[in-house]
């Protein structure tokens, strides 16, 4: 039965919540030292056993994959925090006061968290729709890749009415091809074209359909990795 002024206990609970909020990321998932994880099959989700004083155990269900270690818990603790003073509407949890210990296999004990009163102001996130986008990825093969990329790009935008009608155009040529390829896969470069607009029709199915129409009407040896697709919001 904590009061709103039991800041140390609240800070410990906040730390526990932060550790388990991303699920398996605290039990070995997305962990830089992934070779330490015995298995990723049936990875267990984290469990927080919180004590009256605000200390807690992080563990997982037995006979599940993954790993609960000082490393996995610390990695998640540092995830998306910005400052060691982790701000919450109820308390500020000072993560630099925490003590993290391996209690047993897949059991980590976290204690010592100090808390302070919450701030008067809070951060608010507002997400705005940017518009609509469509894109395609083309595989270019053979010689003269740079010239081929320039040719197909110019042809695509000429057929849809020009680049200037879009709010933004992003063109990227990735030279994954090798100079002396030993297979078809080694001979391929990737050309990525993305277009964005407030008008969904401008970047809709017509845009991708125009690219498909060029399959037999441009240079030889290229193909697309996507068909005719509608636009999507961003």
Predicted regions and their residues:
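A conserved active-site cap/scaffold subdomain adjacent to cofactor or substrate pockets
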Residues: 10-117, 133, 137
